[in-house]
Regions:
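Structured catalytic-domain cores with a bias toward divalent-metal coordination
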Residues: 1-215
Length: 215
């Protein structure tokens, strides 16, 4: 979903196809590979879509009141300082340091990266309407008619989290859902959960997982 991560996702898909993946599927099982759902970001090596939206924050319900991230509003100006003058940068560093001292590192990570819908020019902006990429993915999901299926697994490749060279299996389902227990049953105790605080990632707003759950 993040364009620049398409290189990693494409490599995984090619590896699967070139090493007998389709031929080795058990009877009654299908695998759907969705390639480059954010083609603009992939082509221009950017995280965001052509609308300058973080696709993995764009699955909020725009018919309802959007999720709020007050921490982001507090640090937005420090994250994107008005100039690169020494005094401005020092003040920005001081604001961020004060936020961390008051709320902790993990709270800062969530404030910065959890997603926000208040600053279109800011980091991790979730947009004000469904993007083309979101609508395209939702149309793919609807075409799969997945609800009658006995089991459905969704693997979404991301990069830049956790130890170097390690693929962390992250479950973003809310705690208590059957999906969380199922993920651990399938992939073992190495599965981490954002809501439980066991993941290198903090909880996120408006993730693509919501698009699957709505179907």
């Amino acid at each position: 979903v993040h364009g620049v991560e398409g290189f990693c996702g494409s490599a995984a898909q090619l590896d699967r196809l070139e090493n007998g993946g389709p031929q080795n599927l058990p009877e009654g099982m299908a695998a759907i590979l969705v390639h480059a759902i954010n083609p603009h970001g992939f082509a221009w090596q950017r995280r965001v879509t052509e609308e300058n939206v973080d696709l993995n924050r764009n699955f909020a319900d725009f018919a309802q009141k959007l999720p709020d991230n007050p921490g982001y509003r507090e640090i937005h100006d420090a994250l994107l300082p008005a100039s690169l003058d020494d005094a401005v940068l020092k003040n920005a560093d001081a604001v961020i340091a004060a936020y961390k001292a008051k709320h902790g590192e993990r709270a800062f990570q969530y404030a910065r990266g959890g997603g926000q819908y208040s600053h279109a020019d800011g980091f991790f902006y979730g947009g004000d309407a469904p993007t083309w990429s979101r609508k395209t993915l939702e149309s793919i999901i609807a075409g799969l008619d997945a609800r009658p299926r006995k089991h459905v697994a969704v693997i979404d490749f991301h990069t830049g989290l956790g130890p170097y060279g390690y693929g962390e299996p992250i479950c973003v389902h809310p705690l208590g859902l059957l999906a969380s227990a199922r993920a651990k049953a399938w992939w073992g105790e190495s599965v981490t959960e954002t809501d439980a605080g066991t993941s290198s990632s903090t909880p996120r707003l408006g993730t693509a997982e919501l698009g699957w759950r709505r179907q």
